[in-house]
Amino acid sequence: GINNMNILLTILVTFFAGMGAGLGTGFAGMSAAAVISPMLITFLGMDPYMAVGIALSSDVLASAVSAYTYGKNKNLDVKNGLIMMVSVLAFTVVGSYVSSLVPAATMGNFSVFMTFLLGIKFIVRPVMTTKEAMQGVSAGKRAAQSVICGVLIGFICGFIGAGGGMMMLLILTSVLGYELKTAVGTSVFIMAFTAFTGAASHFAIGGAPDWTVLILCVLFTLIWARIAAVFANKATPKTLNRATGVILVLLGIVVTIRVITDRGQTKDRISVAEAENELEEATGVSLKLDGAY
C-alpha cells in the first residue's frame, strides 16, 4: 500500500510542480526552479541540492521548446539573444566574485517579492510596445544594448544571487523597450543554456538524480510550457500581459506561503537559502544565473 501511495504522491507533486513551472516558463520566461525545487523539498522531502538539479533539468527542455515556439512565431531575436547570453554568463561570475568580497549581500526573499511585484506591474501597466517600434532601433545599437543589458542582468544575478528570469523580463521590457512576446522569447532562449550548465554541474557534483522524479518533472513541465507558449504566441498583447501578470502573482504567493510555513518547521532540514549557499560555493555560478529564488 505504501508504495502505491508514494507513487501517487510523486505523480501528483510532480504534475502540479511541472504545471506551475511550465506555465511560468511558457508565459513569462520564468525559471522552473522557483516552483519545482520548493515543491520537491516540501512535499517529497527531497535533498535540496538534488531538487534544484531536477528543477534545472526541467528548465532546459521547457525553455528550449518555448524558445522554439516563440522563434517559429518570429518572436525571438536569436542573434541578440546569443550576445546577451554571453554577457550574462560572464558577468554572473563577476557579480559572484564581487559579492564574495562584500559581506552579507544576499537578499533571500528578494526574488519572490520581485516576482509578485512584476506580476502586478503587468496587470496594471501592460507592456504595449509594438514590434515596429522595436525594429526602429538600428542593428548596431540593438547589439550594444544587448551587451549592456546582459552585463546588468548577470551582475545583479551574481551579486544578489536571485531573479535571473525576472530580471531579464523586467530589463528587456522596461530598459530595452522589447515587445512582451519577444522579451519572453529571448528570456527562455537564454534560460535553456544557463539551466543546462546549472543542471550539468549539479549532477556532476551531487551524483545521479532520482530518475522517476526527474523524468516526471521534465515531462510535465515540457507539456505545460508548450501549451503556454502556443497560447502566448496567439494572444493579443493585452491578454498576454494579464495572463503573465496573474501567473507571476500566483507563483509569488505560492512560494511566499512556502517560505513562511518553512520557517515554522524543524530546523534539522536545511533551509533552502543554506542549500543555495552551499551550491554556490560548489558551482560558483549555476544557481544565480537561473535565479531560482
Segment roles from a protein language model:
Residues S58, T186-H202, T212-A225:
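A small-residue-rich subset of transmembrane alpha-helices
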Residues M46-I54, K79-N80, G177-V188:
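Membrane-interface alpha-helices at helix entry/exit sites of multi-pass transporters
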Residues G1-L23, S37, I41-F43, P48, ...:
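Juxtamembrane transmembrane-helix boundary motif
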Residues G22, V52-V60, L89, V184-A195, ...:
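Transmembrane helix-bundle signature of multi-pass membrane transporters/permeases
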Residues F27-I36, G161-I171:
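Transmembrane helix boundary and interhelical junction motifs in multipass membrane proteins
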Residues T130-K131, A162-M167, Y178-T182:
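Short, structured loop/turn "capping" segments at alpha-beta junctions
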Residues S37, S57, L61-A64, F116, ...:
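Alpha-helical transmembrane segments of polytopic integral membrane proteins
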